[in-house]
């Protein structure tokens, strides 16, 4: 039976347009049904506040982990740590059905340390993608209903793909920095499809699912070329990164079993474990530039390409889905009135704004899924040195009300705490 993507989109816990808090889900969107789910926007609140740029960002106050080469821009005696989280509100609409939900997610934990002069070490944890959806649709064919009784089809999923990484970077001469990261991808994706039969006051369910265990290693390379101009008043930075594509490995567990009215399994239809997980994370190429006046303002742009068309995902019953190449274009700006002002606090605040356009790796019902949005952000200085509270908001939209698709509007609030301390000062006296 072929169904529209979100026909009768109904949260299992509730229906209608009331907002719901989704516990333990890093996202809540019907589009996470496909592939490895919703790809998370990378970067801290500093990056997201500028539309997500970071490939050519060099900042000695905050950690920019979008390009491993950027961590050489730092105080050589400093320890830096960045911890972030976000909350995202989704408003989904499909013809006459609408729903609103909230999802909370840990965003990043990243630490950088100096090694020797203009070289540094970085380690961290970052979510790559999230799955979170719950919806249902009833059987509407009168012949099937008359023969088998009322039938409901449920789809629900959860899980995430994450990465642990450790990297290093160094300056080569006065105008070039290079860096490399070693990456460990890990996580589990759960996708379930249930069929519930109701007849003669008896409810029976056939529960089917696919559990994907992710385990793979990869690497990311980065470089930044930076040169002053206009009598050293401004700095131009060109950046590039490349992540190696990898099979995500791990096991796939396929299962199906029948339950009685109490939900207890009464018959296992099949249970297979396959170690040949063919899901692939394709290579990613990103380039960008920034122009800045130190401690005053910066403007920049990033472009990212990822060849998802070369990977394959299990089909989704009733939906025409295929993977395609993804593209994104991001622009951003930041401005600090006077970071050394001792009288007016808000002159020391850094203000940010940006925008983006993304063509997702998902092609649904023959149509490319695109998103666009605007972002705002700021850095609020805390205490001494460069400790700060970084805030950002992302307002965007993707999908449409045409071609049996879903229009999704979202607001994402991001908060990062930046810790900056001097750990490696030699004492003057014994």
Q: Model regions: which residues?
A:
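Sec-dependent N-terminal signal peptides
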Residues: 4-13
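Sec/Tat signal peptide C-region and signal peptidase I cleavage site
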Residues: 15-19
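Subset of outer-membrane beta-barrel
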Residues: 20-430
């Amino acid at each position: 039976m072929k169904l529209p993507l979100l026909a009768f989109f109904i949260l299992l816990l509730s229906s209608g347009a009331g907002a719901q808090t989704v516990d333990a889900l890093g996202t809540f969107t019907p589009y996470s049904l496909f592939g490895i789910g919703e790809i998370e926007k990378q970067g801290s609140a500093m990056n997201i506040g500028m539309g997500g740029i970071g490939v050519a960002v060099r900042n000695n106050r905050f950690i920019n982990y979008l390009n491993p080469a950027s961590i050489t821009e730092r105080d050589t005696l400093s320890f830096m740590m960045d911890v972030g989280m976000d909350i995202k509100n989704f408003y989904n609409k499909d013809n006459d059905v609408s729903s609103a939900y909230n999802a909370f997610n840990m965003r990043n934990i990243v630490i950088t340390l100096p090694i020797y002069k203009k070289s540094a070490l970085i380690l961290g944890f970052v979510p790559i993608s999230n799955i979170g959806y719950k919806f249902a649709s009833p059987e509407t064919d009168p012949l099937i209903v008359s023969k088998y009784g009322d039938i409901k089809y449920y789809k629900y999923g959860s899980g995430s793909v994450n990465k642990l990484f450790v990297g290093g970077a160094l300056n080569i001469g006065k105008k070039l920095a290079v860096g490399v990261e070693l990456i460990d991808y890990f996580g589990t994706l759960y996708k379930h499809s249930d069929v519930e039969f109701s007849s003669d006051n008896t409810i029976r369910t056939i529960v089917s699912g696919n559990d994907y265990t992710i385990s793979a290693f990869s690497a990311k390379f980065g470089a930044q070329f930076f040169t002053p101009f206009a009598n050293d008043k401004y700095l131009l930075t060109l950046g590039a990164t490349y992540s190696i594509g990898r099979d995500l490995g791990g096991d796939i567990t396929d299962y199906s079993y029948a339950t009685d009215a109490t939900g207890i399994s009464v018959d296992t239809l099949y249970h297979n474990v396959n170690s040949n997980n063919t899901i692939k994370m394709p290579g990613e190429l990103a380039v960008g530039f920034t122009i800045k006046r130190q401690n005053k303002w910066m403007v920049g742009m990033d472009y990212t390409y990822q060849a998802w068309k070369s990977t394959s995902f299990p089909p989704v019953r009733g939906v025409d889905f295929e993977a395609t190449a993804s593209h994104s274009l991001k622009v951003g700006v930041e401005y600090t009135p006077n970071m050394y002002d001792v009288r007016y606090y808000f002159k020391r605040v850094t203000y940010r704004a940006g925008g983006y356009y993304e063509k997702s790796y998902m092609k649904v019902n023959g149509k490319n899924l695109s998103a666009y949005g605007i972002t705002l952000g700021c850095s609020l200085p805390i205490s001494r040195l460069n400790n700060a509270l970084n805030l950002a908001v992302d307002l965007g939209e993707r999908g449409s009300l045409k071609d049996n698709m879903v229009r999704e509007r979202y607001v994402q609030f991001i908060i990062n705490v930046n810790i900056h301390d001097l750990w490696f000062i030699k004492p003057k006296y014994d």
